[in-house]
Amino acid sequence: MDDFRSICLLSLAMLVACYVAGIIPLAVNFSEERLKLVTVLGAGLLCGTALAVIVPEGVHALYEDILEGKHHPANEMQHVMESEKVAEIAVVHEYGHDHSRLHAYIGVSLVLGFVFMLLVDQIGSSHVHSTDDPEAARSGNSKITTTLGLVVHAAADGVALGAAASTSQTSVQLIVFVAIMLHKAPAAFGLVSFLMHAGLERNRIRKHLLVFALAAPVMSMVTYLGLSKSSKEALSEVNATGVAMLFSAGTFLYVATVHVLPEVGGIAHSHRPESTGGKGLSRLEVAALVLGCLIPLVLSIGHHH
């Protein structure tokens, strides 16, 4: 019951914090220039979050058991007698086997997340291409895919938190929760600023934000309640928390690189005055993009395990 109470509190905190972070761009009235800067900053936050927070957290979650197992025997190695060294070698060999298996998990999870979003994007765009205005169709599809990608990513986060809660280890739950919050708040901010620039009405943006904010808490509750005892044991065997986070990192990378960054490049090309040759971002926008990439990195460095 304690686990259930903690997952409820964590889910509620996640929902509120995510929604509040996303409302900030809506609450402040930006001029067109400021809105462009905020959009570029949001794009940087999405990219920096994917690379500096989600991928390392997923890898850490995968390797956690092995790392913990290795630290304990390491100090005792000096005191181990000759007869016991054979057993140690066998254990080290086993770790090597586990490492190669986990390497495969990392690549497969990331690629599957990326390919999943690619397929969702293609299926979505095939329905929209029949309209008369292909530019408007592509723009509308981009908004939907960006939101859908982040919702899928948030749902995978929820599965990771639900799987972590089912381990009954408070430290694991808190680590996963902090990791999720470190990127959900910037992602919510980035999503809303992107949708604002894309010209969506404010009410619809709020709906998109609410769906995004709800995805992780709902999935964490469903995962926690839906797992039987045997399922929990099976999930801990295959490190479901790490796999889910890496899958979500793949979806996040797709959204950040394929949709948001090119859109930001498009902003620059369409609004740049003739004197600059119509190429690239302004220095201030480049600075905002770099700052956005660095903020999650600084936050993740401050977040020690």
From Swiss-Prot:
Q: Record keywords: Transmembrane included?
A: yes
Positions of transmembrane segments: 7-27, 35-55, 104-124, 144-164, 174-194, 208-228, 242-262, 284-304
Query: Which reactions is this enzyme annotated as catalysing?
Result: Zn(2+)(in) = Zn(2+)(out)
- Taxonomic source organism: Gallus gallus
Could you say which protein family the record assigns here? Belongs to the ZIP transporter (TC 2.A.5) family.
Report the domain of life of the source organism: Eukaryota
What's the protein here called? Answer: Zinc transporter ZIP9
Q: Which UniProt keywords apply?
A: Cell membrane, Cytoplasm, Glycoprotein, Golgi apparatus, Ion transport, Membrane, Mitochondrion, Nucleus, Transmembrane, Transmembrane helix, Transport, Zinc, Zinc transport
Question: Its topology with respect to the membrane?
Answer: Multi-pass membrane protein
Compartments, record wording: Golgi apparatus, trans-Golgi network membrane; Cell membrane; Cytoplasm, Perinuclear region; Mitochondrion
Q: Name the Gene Ontology biological process terms.
A: bicellular tight junction assembly; intracellular zinc ion homeostasis; regulation of cellular response to testosterone stimulus; regulation of vascular endothelial cell proliferation; zinc ion transmembrane transport
Q: Which Pfam families does this chain map to?
A: Zip (PF02535)
Task: Outline what the protein does.
Answer: Transports zinc ions across cell and organelle membranes into the cytoplasm and regulates intracellular zinc homeostasis. Participates in the zinc ions efflux out of the secretory compartments. Regulates intracellular zinc level, resulting in the enhancement of AKT1 and MAPK3/MAPK1 (Erk1/2) phosphorylation in response to the BCR activation. Also functions as a membrane androgen receptor that mediates, through a G protein, the non-classical androgen signaling pathway, characterized by the activation of MAPK3/MAPK1 (Erk1/2) and transcription factors CREB1 or ATF1.
- Which terms in the Gene Ontology molecular function aspect does this entry carry? androgen binding; G protein-coupled receptor activity; zinc efflux transmembrane transporter activity; zinc ion transmembrane transporter activity
Q: What is its main location?
A: Golgi
